[in-house]
Each structure stands twice: as structure tokens, then as C-alpha cells.
Amino acid sequence: MMTLQQLLPNTTLPATAAGVVLSGLQLDSRKVMPGDAFLAVQGVASDGRQFVSQAIAAGAVAVLAEAETFSVQQEQAVPRVNFPGLSRSVGELAARWYGEPGSAMNVVGVTGTNGKTSITWFLRDALNALGHRCALVGTLGLGLKDNEQITGHTTPDPITLQAGLARVLEAGADTVAMEVSSHALDQHRLGPTPVSVAVFSNLSRDHLDYHGDMEAYLAAKSVLFTRDGVKLAVINCDDPVAYSLVGCLADGVRCVTFGDQTGATVRCASVAFTAEGTNAELNVGGESFSVTLPLFGRFNLSNLMAVAGILHGQGVSTDSLAGALAAITPVPGRMEPVQQAGCPTVIVDYAHTPDGLEKALQACRAHFAGRLFCIIGCGGDRDTGKRPQMAAVAERGADHVVFTSDNPRSEDPQKIIDEMCAGLTDTGSVQIIVERDRAVMDTVQAASDGDVILLAGKGHEDYQEVNGVRYPSDDRDLAHKAFNARGGAQ
């Protein structure tokens, strides 16, 4: 509980408003409970100021909005406060409400187009093996291991984030491995949460429907590395923008690099890819050791090196580091094999960018010897410019390609596929099966038991989103159903 004046210590309020006791903060008028303060933020998709009356009807006892027409008047039963820059300040307000929980933990923020989920997942496993209690914030949820709560976003809204940080702190977390999206950085979702370690995985085309161009996309990512409190930066030195990020670091920030370059702090001395995973020799700070893990793809080796860099940069010895990396487990829906005797191997992966798809296809080639099938679609109401690029990557990288649906949302699935086809050199080179379940079924039937099928785009997701409705659909379940229909051994 907190008064309105305590929430807004730098705002002059009438006594009747200042003493209003709040029981919670809410951004969504539909979720307002009696006693809450409603923060009517003007967002990208909707404007909270249009729902003030609904929030008050639901029991809101105060309303904050960026609106000059708002003023606190003595006679108002529900104080309405004009708060300039509210959208940029929600994180600060939420952190104040929850007691700034991030300040009591070591927060590691990971940004980049691809790899955020895997790096944070691997880091949590490794830190837990070292005796820490590390919480996860990202695509797969917010929480300690096996107690994640799905938030619906890579980086949740500021109130959900601070509430989650408070929850994991109370549960004993000492470290947080957080995915930090470009949207979150641009929208100030982290608020004042101190990030002590900033990590960069890579940069390739994505989210240009939001950022407009790659320069703005990079600028949003760069914000993570210029935040106050960053003590360690861990950067993929193989990416062309790496040294741009190094150049923006403040004096005194230690920089650890990982990649294939000779001068990298963390690099791979040798690697062998098998149908069971990856065997690699890593060199970390001049010392070498071997790791064998059930991980697929060179990009996962890069993710592994990022984690090694984070731990090395925080003083973990090589011996302890080797043991911690050995405890890493595969990420659900990230190069996840689904197998059944007598059937082709299906690899379920979240790849939904041209670069991510290309790397997933390359991984399948490296680990498996049979023909390579690729089932791919593109999400509706998202960056349309990458659709032909995704198609071109699939055509170039696979032996057989099937275009299908992938969360069409409000768009016509066939229209999305038609736009993908613009990137093909031969439109007759692909098969089009709009229904995703049928695409999986038919492809499993067509492939041989020594072949591999990359089922890309949805990964861990357990739904297909059509016109605002999320229908149950899990690619792993679709693969098992296709195996059973084919008659593979149980």
C-alpha cells in the first residue's frame, strides 16, 4: 500500500489527492481492481486515455495520464493527474511501488536479434550449478526454474516486470538473466533497474515495422550498454556492429568478447557436430577445456561462448566454468529434436528471421546426413519486408521447402505466402500447404527415416493466432501426430 503522494514525491498534489491510498498499479483498464491507480499510457496499439471512465468504473481511485486537460481538482472524487512523459516513467513508478527489487540482485541483460532466449536459459542453468539462484525473464516466462510465469512478451511491461522481480527476490533469487528487447529499450520498460552485465548476441533484420530502419534498430539495442550501472559488457566480436557497441561503453566498463576472431576473450578452438549434439574445445582467457552438450548448431556454440564470457567476466575460474557449462540443458523450442523410430527427425525451432532461419538450416546440415526439408511461414501483422527474404533463405538452404501458416493474425494466410513467393527464383520449387497441421503431416509422410525436417517459426509456442484468437497448436505435438499416422515405432 502507498499513498498517491508517496508514488509521486515530486508532484505537488492537493491534500485530498495526496492522501489517497493505492492498492496497486494497472496499465490495462480491464484488469483494474478497486483501489488501483490507473496509468493511462498512450501506447503503440492503443491509447489508455480512452479507457479512463472504464477504469474508474472498475474501482480506480486515481488516474495518471499525459494529458494537459487533466488537472487535480478538490472536487474530483477520483484524482486525475497530468503526468508529462508518463510512458517513459512507468518503469520508475513501478520500481518505486515494488521497492526497487532489481537493486538487490545481479541483473544480466541480454539483447540482440537472435540468441537472447538461449543465452539467458543457458546462463540460468550454469549459475544454478554454481550455487546461485538465478531467475529468468524472457520469452519463456519470468521466474525461478520450473516456476516461470508466462508474460506474453520478451521483456514484459514495466509493472509486470517489477512485480516479477519482487516475486523472485522474495523467493530467494540473487541473479536475474533477462532478455532485453529493442522494443523494451525504446519504451523504457526497465525503468531504473540496474543492469550490471550487458550482453550482445548479434544483429540482423527484424522489427523494422517498428523501428523503420537498421540504424534505428541498432540505436535501440545500444541503449543497454550506455545505462548507468553497467560494469561488464559481453559482446559478440564476429558481428559487424560489435565495435560500435564497444565504442559507446563508459570508462571503467570491462569488455569481454566472444567469437571466432583470434583476439576474442572466449573462442572455440575446435568443434565436432553429431546427431547427438556438439563436442567443442573452448578457450577462455587463455585456458582451454572441452564440453559435450546436447545442443545443435554453430549459433548455439556462440550462445554457449556468450555464457562463458559472462561467467569469466565475473571472476568464475576455468575449472568451475567447465562444470557449470556441463550443466546446461537444451531450450524448449530451440533446435529441439522430436524423434520416433522409423520416422524422420523433426527439429522444432523458433527461427523467424532470415538470419535465424539460415543458421537453423546450416545446423541441420551439420548434424544430419539425410535430405533436408523445411516447413516455414511468416507471421501476420509483422515486418512484411522479411517475407521474401525468408523464402529465399529456405529455397537456398533446403532440399524441399513447404510454405505454410505461422500466426497469420489479422492477415490472409495465402496473401502472406504470396508475398513470400516473391523471393523465390523458382516458384515451382516449393510446396504450399496453408494449414500447418496438414503441412507437417504431409511432409513427415514424404520424408524418409534418415531425413531431417526443420519445422521453423513457432518453437515453444503452443498456439496459432488467427484474428485475435489463439487456437491450441504445438509443433512438437503436430510432429508426434504425424509420426503416429505414419506408423513409426512407439
Curated annotation (Swiss-Prot):
Compartmental location: Cytoplasm
Residues that, per the record, bind ATP: 112-118
GO molecular function: ATP binding; magnesium ion binding; UDP-N-acetylmuramoylalanyl-D-glutamate-2,6-diaminopimelate ligase activity
Keyword Cytoplasm part of the UniProt annotation: yes
Main EC class the enzyme belongs to: ligase
GO CC annotations on file: cytoplasm
UniProt binding sites for meso-2,6-diaminopimelate: 382, 406-409, 457, 461
E.C. number(s) listed in UniProt: 6.3.2.13
Chief location category: cytoplasm
Pathway of action: Cell wall biogenesis; peptidoglycan biosynthesis
N6-carboxylysine PTM sites in chain numbering: 221
Chain residues that bind UDP-N-acetyl-alpha-D-muramoyl-L-alanyl-D-glutamate: 27, 29, 154-155, 181, 187, 189
InterPro entries reported for this sequence: Mur-like_cat_sf (IPR036565), Mur_ligase_C (IPR004101), Mur_ligase_C_dom_sf (IPR036615), Mur_ligase_cen (IPR013221), Mur_ligase_N (IPR000713), MurE/MurF_N (IPR035911), UDP-N-AcMur-Glu-dNH2Pim_ligase (IPR005761)
GO BP annotations, alphabetical order: cell division; cell wall organization; peptidoglycan biosynthetic process; regulation of cell shape
Task performed by this protein: Catalyzes the addition of meso-diaminopimelic acid to the nucleotide precursor UDP-N-acetylmuramoyl-L-alanyl-D-glutamate (UMAG) in the biosynthesis of bacterial cell-wall peptidoglycan.
HAMAP family the UniProt entry points to: MurE
NCBIfam families linked to this entry: murE, PRK00139.1-2, PRK00139.1-4
Protein name as catalogued: UDP-N-acetylmuramoyl-L-alanyl-D-glutamate--2,6-diaminopimelate ligase
